[in-house]
């Protein structure tokens, strides 16, 4: 164990103001709520000096831990293996796929040398050429490609570039005859077109069938790409290739609802333009449809309001003529597929693939024009099925697979690909070919090979435990096979629990390296608020039932100790974004000694003010509105920053945040650490905040070196807090 000294109370001075906000409570009337750290919401010289002092303290503590450098070396080695995506055949006659040699900060987009599906056993560089290398966008790794889409005819490539991980990005366009590689940059050739589409955020790129342009969502120009003011006045626009952004058509904007955001899609045959409207992050949206003629997208579009009330989630799958197939949770919390015939004045909704009561329909794609590939999530394990054009289930694919799956295909092609991964499955690409003999249609295209780890040395199991209110909760437990369940191991417990997002099995060489190095286990409970069991599971952990999310997470740790999966006091918890709220709320609510360490990353801590910054107003559907008295009464007791006790020993805590996070603004983390340090200044365990003052984003897109350092700091802190000895399990 690395020797690290800690002197309680050695924190930077944090000014406390007499600022008080007043809220209305349905049960108590007017409630004054002190906010002594309200000044940390601003961007001032005082805040800058405070963040520097806090960051320096955290770094000085981490620098004492010699294990961190050793972990960084191990993590870097464990990440050094080839990674790849499923290939896609475009209309230019080439296959395209992403490939990463191992430690590249961003995967490189390759293009096949020949029209045939590449034989990847010969090596990616032998069967393909670099088409687009995002690593050359900025020498220091500060620019990243966050999204890309090819035009339907395969002639254009549109890609969005973000700087320092920020949510705002700019779309550029290039011809597919103009690759971007290390070689082209060395020759001083960029090759992109003049198109420059700015202020792109929370959207995708939707090409029209004629390949003349694309739709996208943008926000009004602002002085700074990131900031804390609310996101408002989004607009869905159409950009024609070869024109300026000033010439773009505003396809839709609702000035009466400036907080709403939009999505769009076009039908495979180019006949329909679909517009989605969202008022928040709830699984409910409007669906409008417009018919396009030979002139394509133009001003003054006439919209048919097919769904004009926020009652359910609607997501277009495809259309066969005027018959549109939609994945929805309308009267089906586990989701189903319906059809609507747009040729009728009063479209009738018909079930196509009915809801399954014990499995959530997670993804549906149309394949080979008339078949449907569906992924169901049953007990947090993905199952893949093929359906006929009549909605009849034909077969199950990869029945022995346990993990998470995704589908990649183009509707008109006679094949589709599946990406399969799990806690100890680094990644397999499978192909289904409709033209092959039936017994040969499903095959493995390529499998990820990990260099420094043997995935077969690890195993994952699923257990069920009882939460505080008696609800049964599933939880995955991952371990190196040499680690015993005898009550001596440390446990890393990870969670999210919000926004109907499922905590699916995922492969992490860093986590497996930590488990192997320290003989620990990794636990992922499927807590309420997530989407593992459909919308009812989500509703069981949002707004007035949000307390269940924390109770489920705390009960998971107690179960691990009681059943000898973990040692008492050696459960460390980790989560990011909404998962950061989960971690902060759990250490505040749990009995003393439940957790040995906590690392909340970029989390929400002030539940009385979250809706006043950037996109936070969209989260009211998840957390509630503190301005409404009845909702204030259940929000206030859950808000982490307002419920830190002064008489309770807190676990070793390392909060991590990026100074320019434009999604969950850093004031949440700032206020929470200031409150912890003030309320329990003599806490025997460190209460620290690591602030990355060079990064804008919410945590995504960091260069490899920065990611490895962050991981080593986090896991090294946890190892020290739990008193773990660095070792290697043979």
Curated annotation (Swiss-Prot):
Family annotation (Pfam families): Peptidase_S9, Peptidase_S9_N
Gene Ontology molecular-function annotations: oligopeptidase activity; serine-type endopeptidase activity
Keyword entries, A-Z: Hydrolase, Protease, Serine protease
Cellular component annotations (GO), alphabetically ordered: cytosol
Superkingdom, natural source: Eukaryota
Catalytic function, reaction form: Hydrolysis of Pro-|-Xaa >> Ala-|-Xaa in oligopeptides
Gene Ontology BP terms: proteolysis
Transmembrane portions of the chain: none
Alphabetized Gene3D superfamilies for the sequence: alpha/beta hydrolase, Prolyl oligopeptidase, N-terminal domain
GTP-binding listed as a keyword: no
Assigned EC number: 3.4.21.26
Active-site residues, record numbering mapped to chain: 577, 661, 698
Coiled-coil intervals, chain numbering: none
InterPro entries, per the entry: AB_hydrolase_fold (IPR029058), Pept_S9_AS (IPR002471), Pept_S9A_N (IPR023302), Peptidase_S9_cat (IPR001375), Peptidase_S9A (IPR002470), Prolyl_oligopep/macrocyclase (IPR051167)
Statement: the UniProt record of this protein carries the keyword Protease: yes
Region (Disordered): 1-34
Complexes and interactors: Monomer.
Sequence similarity: Belongs to the peptidase S9A family.
Function: Dual function macrocyclase-peptidase involved in the biosynthesis of the highly toxic amanitin toxin family of macrocycles. Cleaves peptide bonds on the C-terminal side of prolyl residues. The enzyme first removes 10 residues from the N-terminus of a 35-residue substrate. Conformational trapping of the 25 amino-acid peptide forces the enzyme to release this intermediate rather than proceed to macrocyclization. The enzyme rebinds the 25 amino-acid peptide in a different conformation and catalyzes macrocyclization of the N-terminal eight residues.
Record protein name field: Dual function macrocyclase-peptidase POPB
Taxonomic source organism: Galerina marginata (strain CBS 339.88)
